[in-house]
A protein has these predicted regions:
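Non-catalytic, mostly N-terminal accessory regions of nucleic-acid modification and defense proteins
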Residues: 1-214, 218-219, 280-286, 291
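Generic recognition of stable, solvent-exposed alpha-helical segments in well-folded globular domains
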Residues: 8-15, 37, 162, 181, ...
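Short, surface-exposed linear patches
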Residues: 54-56, 276-277, 303-304, 322-324
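A short, mixed-charge helix-start or loop-turn motif at secondary-structure junctions
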Residues: 197, 251, 323-325
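Conserved S-adenosyl-L-methionine
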Residues: 201-302, 307-309, 336
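Mobile active-site "lid"/loop adjacent to the S-adenosyl-L-methionine
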Residues: 306-337, 341
Length: 341
């Protein structure tokens, strides 16, 4: 994809984000915007997968779910649902797709109850599945009853509807082979823009690309391929993704203390095309409860943010101590979590 098209998508998504901004803080409108983008991506991805699976049956995903029920229809629905769960880890019935929400908006309907159910259905579809931990509570930060969206129910519905309509006009490129590059890049750009607006708090969830690139290149020195990579304070996962990409790592592991940032990290993994079975992000304080114990890792990267003498160490401060305090392990033995001090 050309840089021109890449920049166009970035600009379009940032314009959508600013429709939500209003009186919200950078972090508040970040969670709503990124959550809605992610919902559209999941909807388009599953619709494409299901339609491709039904080509020989000469029906579409939506048509199959509106057909009169009989044994054959139910069996085919079961086959499609199973294929989706095995391949992408979740399932969305056609009536809860992003495109169905758009149809309701165009009919001037109140879409908030339906949207809330749609997000919940995505999470619930993974219960008992191998992907349950990757999707559980993923949309918990999207509070559609929040007064930040408007004073009245109508105000909230109007604002959210306008944002979703604006997203509907943007081509995410899910039909194209470059979908991962397109959305992954745009999502990272959005997070970086929100980080810029968050000021000193940015270091809690985002590592600038320059820092990520340096760490990722160091961690791959002398290694054509890493088996796995780990970040004990992974934030939104940008550093992990960069290290995994440059090191061609098969598996990604991370832990994040902040529940909201933990959700961003999982979304970031999925939007970059990392299969649910190839990453494991845990929510918790690594110092108090290390989720990975004696797990062996080929490499560890970290951009830790902490208080030192009352001063918050952000990623920019950390740049001065990277060589001394980021320890990169190509492990043949169990490792202990590593931190900046």
């Amino acid at each position: 994809m050309s840089e021109e098209l890449q920049q166009k998508l970035r600009d379009q998504l940032w314009e959508v984000a600013n429709k939500l901004r209003g009186n919200m803080s950078a972090s508040d409108f970040m969670y709503f915007t990124l959550g809605f983008i992610f919902y559209k991506y999941l909807s388009e991805k599953i619709e494409k997968l299901a339609n491709d699976a039904l080509v020989d049956d000469e029906i579409t995903f939506k048509e199959l779910w509106t057909m009169e029920k009989d044994d054959d229809v139910e069996e085919l629905q079961k086959v499609v649902k199973t294929e989706c769960l095995e391949n992408i880890g979740y399932f969305i019935e056609p009536s809860f797709l992003f495109s169905s929400i758009i149809e309701s908006i165009k009919k001037k309907e109140n879409i908030l109850p339906m949207l809330e159910r749609s997000l919940k259905r995505i999470e619930d579809s993974t219960l008992g599945q191998a992907s349950e931990e990757d999707f559980g509570g993923l949309f918990s930060d999207i509070d559609l009853a929040s007064p930040k969206l408007g004073k009245s129910a109508d105000d909230k519905n109007t604002l959210v509807s306008n944002v979703l309509l604006a997203l509907d006009d943007i081509d995410f490129g899910v039909e194209a082979s470059q979908e991962i590059d397109i959305l992954g890049d745009a999502y990272e750009y959005m997070i970086s823009q929100f980080a810029a607006g968050a000021g000193k708090k940015a270091g809690e969830f985002y590592t600038p690309q320059e820092v990520s690139r340096i760490l990722a290149e160091i961690v791959t020195i002398g290694h054509a391929r890493l088996r796995n990579v780990y970040d004990p304070t992974c934030g939104s996962g940008s550093l992990l993704l960069r290290a995994a990409s440059i090191g061609h790592a098969n598996e990604i592991f991370g832990q994040e203390k902040n529940p909201t940032t933990y959700n961003l990290a999982r979304m970031n993994m999925l939007l970059h095309g990392i299969k649910f079975s190839n990453f494991r992000i845990e929510n918790g304080d690594t110092l108090e409860a290390d989720a990975f114990g004696d797990t062996q890792f080929d490499a560890v990267v970290a951009n830790h943010h902490s208080q030192q003498n009352g001063v918050l160490l952000t990623s920019l401060t950390v740049m001065t101590v990277l060589v001394k305090q980021v320890v990169l392990l190509h492990a043949r033995q169990p490792i202990m979590p590593l931190y900046f001090t």
